[in-house]
Amino acid sequence: TRLQKKVKYHRRSISGRKARIKRDGERIMAYLKIFPIKVTDKKALDYITNPDKTDEKLLVSSFGCSPETADLEFSMTREMAKKNGMDKGDNLAFHLIQSFKPGEVDAENAHRLGQQFADEVLKGKYEYVISTHVDKNHIHNHIIFNAASFVDHHKYVSNKRSYHKLCRISNRI
């Protein structure tokens, strides 16, 4: 039922990792949260590219795919990984949220920082779509990236160690 779907989604989002990045005891820029997408990446991609939230899609960009067809391209990459025996785990993609304090950055700089962050984290191996949402009082980036690499077909490993690496990279940028 509809309620069960909401509860299931809520449980998945709670299982995501999140933390405010700190340096020398003081809070700085980004608040990070990552969680797996296990059921459908199309709905998540539609949500993050919503024109009402992204300044009419001016704040949407991608790497290795087109934002409009990313779900199909992600799927084709996963199929190739499966054919090569590299499709382990049930994660289709990962959803990363990078939030900034109100007034800390403008939309264009937030988007640029998000792109730099995604490029450094994913090292040109994973397709991704990034969007910057400006519909709330805090500007935030949504980055959805394929769980399977289009270069070597290995799956992205999300654990505490990889999460702390994400925090360090975001902190540096």
Predicted regions and their residues:
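N-terminal nicking endonuclease/strand-transfer module with a His-rich metal-binding environment
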Residues: 3-173
